[in-house]
Amino acid sequence: MTMELQRPREAAALTLSLLDLTNLREDCTPQQIATLCQRAHTEFGNTAAICIWPRFVAQARAAFGKDHTIRIATVVNFPSGDLDVATVVAETEAAIGDGADEIDLVIPYRKFMAGDESAVAEMIAAVRKACAAPVLLKVILETGELKDKALIRRASEIAIAEGADFIKTSTGKVAVNATLEAADIMLQAIRDSKKKVGFKPAGGIGTVEDATLYLRLAETIMAPNWAMPSTFRFGASGVLDDVLNVLAGGEPAKAASGY
């Protein structure tokens, strides 16, 4: 285990640098987005990104201007995964036009669970085509709904094959979100692919201690110091409070506080 993950302050600093600070509440307001943009800049450094609804991307881009130090991530086909390909491509193109740096795409997981792998491949390929470099594509598998280990593995493989830059566990909108079990399967799929693909657990990561468990798992499966903003993100909101508390010298929280 690397030294960073043995010390809470170092683990907190790493978590901060990997954080997609998220507000995907249905009742999110422009004022909350303004606050989110401000919170992404901390006295200890910046988060990797913010993750917001498409309707707020233009506002966030206006706040950040031409500075892409903190990236703007948004969601498409979210959270249901049920939209048609043309609609999702249009969502993606509009979000990029508004200034999004990263697209978090939900796969049509219900079709996938019914045996339709081609629907997943087609959706990812179409959105991948719409995400010209340097826009990143993160593919949300909704592992808490897939449940089955073989399905999670296969969804990971399809996403990687179709050009995902990251594979992400969850929307945060279902009963079961990120789990270490799903993370283990997804990280092994990344390792076995021998491709440069990142991993993003989302939902239920509320403390530095929670985050450290995922970082240790990534280190075990991938390599020491593998986790960096180009390979690993956390989708969370509440964890920032504990990160800042620990970095300020406070005691780490024990209990997760959710998405």
From Swiss-Prot:
Q: Where in the cell is it found?
A: Cytoplasm
The active-site annotation reads 104 (proton donor/acceptor), 168 (schiff-base intermediate with acetaldehyde), 200 (proton donor/acceptor)
Lineage, top-rank taxon, reads: Bacteria
Record key words, sorted:
Cytoplasm, Lyase, Schiff base
Q: Where are the transmembrane segments?
A: none
Q: What is its EC number?
A: 4.1.2.4
Intrachain S-S bonds: none
Q: Which GO terms describe its biological process?
A: 2-deoxyribose 1-phosphate catabolic process; carbohydrate catabolic process; deoxyribonucleotide catabolic process
Question: Could you tell me which pathway this protein works in?
Answer: Carbohydrate degradation; 2-deoxy-D-ribose 1-phosphate degradation; D-glyceraldehyde 3-phosphate and acetaldehyde from 2-deoxy-alpha-D-ribose 1-phosphate: step 2/2
Tell me which Pfam families the record gives: DeoC
Matching entries from InterPro entries are given as: Aldolase_TIM, DeoC, DeoC/FbaB/LacD_aldolase, DeoC_typeII
The GO terms describing molecular function are: deoxyribose-phosphate aldolase activity
* Annotated Gene Ontology cellular component terms: cytoplasm
User: What's the catalysed reaction?
Assistant: 2-deoxy-D-ribose 5-phosphate = D-glyceraldehyde 3-phosphate + acetaldehyde
**Can you tell me which family this protein belongs to?**
Belongs to the DeoC/FbaB aldolase family. DeoC type 2 subfamily.
Question: Which function does this protein serve?
Answer: Catalyzes a reversible aldol reaction between acetaldehyde and D-glyceraldehyde 3-phosphate to generate 2-deoxy-D-ribose 5-phosphate.
Stated name of the protein: Deoxyribose-phosphate aldolase
Species of provenance: Agrobacterium fabrum (strain C58 / ATCC 33970)
